[in-house]
Amino acid sequence: MLISKLTPFIERFEEITRLLGTMEVISDIKRMTELSKEQSALEALVLKAKEYLQTHRSIQENRALFEDKELGDLAKEENKLLEESLESLESEIKLLLIPKDPNDDKNIYLEIRAGTGGDEAGIFVGDLFKSYCRYADLKGWKVEIISSSENSVGGYKEVIALIKGNGVYSRLKYEGGTHRVQRVPETESQGRIHTSAITVAIMPEVDDVEVNINPNDLKIDVFRSGGHGGQSVNTTDSAVRITHLPTGISVSMQDEKSQHKNKDKALKILKARLYEAELEAKLSENSAARKLQVGSGDRSERIRTYNYPQNRLTDHRIGLTLYSLEEIMLSGNFDQVVDPIVAHYQAEMMKESED
């Protein structure tokens, strides 16, 4: 069964290799780039597929020797090892056959907002954002704050950042949803535990080709930027609000002194939000992704709890509990949270492909 699935991939890979050597393709940069990308995407699967087919052939050849007086025992011993190898290769190939998320290599817009819980929610927005920044640092990603709105106690009402690097979306796409925090606030004299919530959205950065907006569908308002406590931070109308009329999605931006820069930033985030809305619509077709809120704009569902008194982090989607919350938050090592989610998601996808 698996052999018949693998043959077309090998044939396509060999066809691409042949095409890349033709003058017709060599003289067409666009076509050459497309074929090189396709070849690169197939390479790991094809290498494993060839190894699998060779191992399968060796097993069959050895079986023909089972009755041989001199070589029979040796062939049986060798087949034990080959069958173990075949099983391992099959698992690796099944993972490689999972359709790749086309957004996995994209940069992302990270949007964190304070929800219920007042000042404490705002403080946790800052704490989680700092942890994500540390994670980005560990991964060699670059973080650029696009917009931030601070509250009066050193936290944030909202932070929007652009995170760039290899595989950013593939690792952070599982973070979208409501994150609940339980801890004793520094201002709490009675030592009571407060519960607050924040929402996280992960939106792939998109280009003009992926999201084409009709300018007639946009309502653009300009106004003066307001600082903390209502003081003016700018005497010109540099702040911008863009509303997409068909969906009602709007983005305000006032971090830059230039109206043009604010408009440019707002438009980029608007495109990302529209793309996210499209992903959410498609999500209903993919039950494995839906279970994990992957790429979902549904921020109402609680995905994770951070319980500081117990030093506990729980991801409710897969029943993961880790008693190393403070270490994760301080080091930014989210791999120990993300890896089990990725493994669970891959298992779900494999199950779906087998059904």
Swiss-Prot record:
Post-translational modification: Methylated by PrmC. Methylation increases the termination efficiency of RF1.
Family note: Belongs to the prokaryotic/mitochondrial release factor family.
UniProt xrefs under SMART domains: PCRF (SM00937)
Short name of any one Pfam family annotated for the protein: PCRF
Keywords: Cytoplasm, Methylation, Protein biosynthesis
Taxonomic superkingdom: Bacteria
Cell location: Cytoplasm
In-chain residues carrying the UniProt-annotated modification N5-methylglutamine: Q231
Cellular component GO terms held in the UniProt record: cytoplasm
PANTHER family in the record: LD18447P
Alphabetized InterPro entries for the sequence: PCRF, Pep_chain_release_fac_I, Pep_chain_release_fac_I_sf, Prokaryotic/Mito_RF, RF-1
Protein name: Peptide chain release factor 1
Record GO terms (molecular function): translation release factor activity, codon specific
Known role: Peptide chain release factor 1 directs the termination of translation in response to the peptide chain termination codons UAG and UAA.
Organism: Wolinella succinogenes (strain ATCC 29543 / DSM 1740 / CCUG 13145 / JCM 31913 / LMG 7466 / NCTC 11488 / FDC 602W) (Vibrio succinogenes)
